[in-house]
A protein has these predicted regions:
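Non-catalytic helical/linker scaffolds that mediate oligomerization, partner binding
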Residues: 1-471
Length: 471
């Protein structure tokens, strides 16, 4: 069973039922809808299509809404585009002006208050670089450090700066409400810099019927990296947004940052998605480059929970083949990883009963060479805790409702199984767990299965039992 999950962005190339169904069969686990693009009407068609296909295929396909987030952009130029040279003076203004070779308006009204002399301003994904020399009222006077072409509405970023713009925009709120109405499983919150950003999203979801929607914080700047531990306290996991991150930090540091973030999340028991340009060349070509193959494999070696496709699956020529290729690379890489010694050597923090039971379950499964671990969980929390230890044993996550079943699709090494029966006793609980293991795996007489769960009070967080069964 493939352990590392695959997140796919759904766009024009993958919006038909036929193509999406083939992607699901090829290995798609989570369908991502990017709300930086498209209208609600267009996204409604995607929501309807995803729900229809996953119901027909009887597969636990989760739905992720990716927010636009707090974006900063230049506005427009009289002639659509300009060319700047190194050393040119240039002004950003919060006034409305017709842009030219000397000045352009910006989308964020408070920018002049948040920047300081000496700050760096990156435009167009960091291709054009400015240094702030003076600020007068609404005018931010800069010097061009690295020249290049600028055109309408290009993105801006500010390395090592936390701007004071309100994190949740009205558009993001409208999008979240729309997503809640459509039963989303995850929110990927863009440009998270601090714990409070996640808490703002959490509060909004809780107040509008999205209490069970899990938050994935997108780490896309240096401040997010610096605050990742406190951010993880408030969310279910992170996404390593290597595109914007590669603009904000020196590109040569990206591999080390990726390894650091993956390790941090794994030790904290949080999911981590590695994203951006993993198989970028397959937007146009039927085969990946050798470098892309190594990139995907290295993320798997690092221990990522999931790898993600963006333009490859949303707008590429070969969406199904791209998923097949991703799954093939992941599966082949996992064959060459000896997970047990890595698990034994790791210094995990055991903070509570669920942590302790989950760790003991994994130790026992390795000690007796179990064929499967079966975890019964009301909320999915115990399944996630077992998943964090990255053991070689296949994990079957038993969900008692569809919402949890879908969300388990993003957990490393977990095969979600839906069992909506009421567990009236621990005997019934473990009977159903063993039945799920037999149904999901090719077990032979003599095979050991380790099962864990809680009492049958119907209260989440009561995991306190371990049982070993021999087939």
């Amino acid at each position: 069973m493939r352990k590392t999950k695959i997140v796919c962005t759904i766009g024009p190339a993958s919006s038909s039922e036929e193509v999406f169904a083939e992607m699901c069969r090829a290995g798609l686990n989570v369908a991502r809808l990017n709300f930086s693009h498209g209208t609600h009407a267009e996204h409604q068609q995607k929501f309807d299509m995803i729900r229809k296909v996953r119901r027909e295929l009887e597969l636990p396909i989760a739905i992720m809404l990716d927010t636009k987030g707090p974006e900063y952009r230049i506005r427009t130029f009289k002639n659509k585009e300009i060319m700047l040279k190194d050393g040119d003076p240039f002004t950003f203004t919060t006034r409305q002006v017709d842009g030219d070779e000397t000045i352009v308006s910006v989308s964020y009204a408070g920018l002049a208050n948040d920047l300081s002399v000496g700050d760096t301003v990156l435009v167009n994904n960091g291709l054009v670089i400015f240094e702030v020399e003076n600020i007068e009222g609404t005018e931010i006077h800069c010097r061009v450090v690295t020249g290049g072409e600028l055109s309408d509405c290009k993105s801006m970023s500010f390395p090592h700066k936390v701007l004071e713009q309100v994190y949740l925009s009205e558009q993001d709120k409208d999008d979240l409400l729309f997503g809640i109405q459509n039963g989303i499983d995850f929110v990927a919150a863009s440009f998270v810099s601090r714990k409070q950003d996640v808490l703002d999203v959490r509060r909004f979801l809780d107040e509008h019927g999205g209490r069970d929607v899990e938050i994935i914080a997108k780490i896309e700047n240096q401040t997010g990296i610096d605050n990742v531990e406190e951010i993880c306290q408030a969310c279910s996991g992170i996404m390593i947004g290597r595109g914007d991150l590669g603009v904000e930090v020196p590109f040569a540091e990206l591999p080390a940052i990726q390894k650091y973030l993956i390790t941090k999340c794994r030790l904290l028991g949080k999911r981590v998605i590695t994203a951006t340009e993993m198989l970028e060349s397959m937007i146009h070509n039927p085969r990946p480059t050798r470098a892309e193959i190594s990139d995907v494999a290295n993320a798997v070696y690092d221990g990522t929970s999931a790898v993600m496709l963006s333009g490859e699956s949303a707008a590429g020529k070969y969406p199904v083949r791209t998923v097949q290729t991703m799954a093939e690379i992941v599966e082949e890489t996992e064959k060459h990883i000896d997970y047990e010694p890595l698990f034994r050597a790791e210094a995990f923090q055991i903070k509570n009963m669920v942590d302790a039971i989950s760790h003991a379950t994994c130790c026992m499964a390795c000690d007796i060479h179990a064929k499967a671990i079966v975890v019964s969980s009301l909320s999915g929390a115990t399944v996630r805790m077992v998943s964090r230890f990255r053991v070689p044993v296949d994990i079957i996550g038993m969900a008692t409702n569809e919402r949890v079943w879908y969300r388990l699709a993003l957990s490393w090494g977990v095969q979600p199984v839906l069992c909506e029966e009421t567990f009236t006793s621990t005997d019934v609980l473990f009977y159903n767990a063993l039945r799920a293991a037999k149904k999901s795996m090719h077990l032979q007489p003599g095979d050991n299965v380790v099962m864990t769960g809680g009492n049958t009070t119907g209260t989440s967080g009561n995991t306190n039992l371990i049982k070993v069964e021999t087939i």
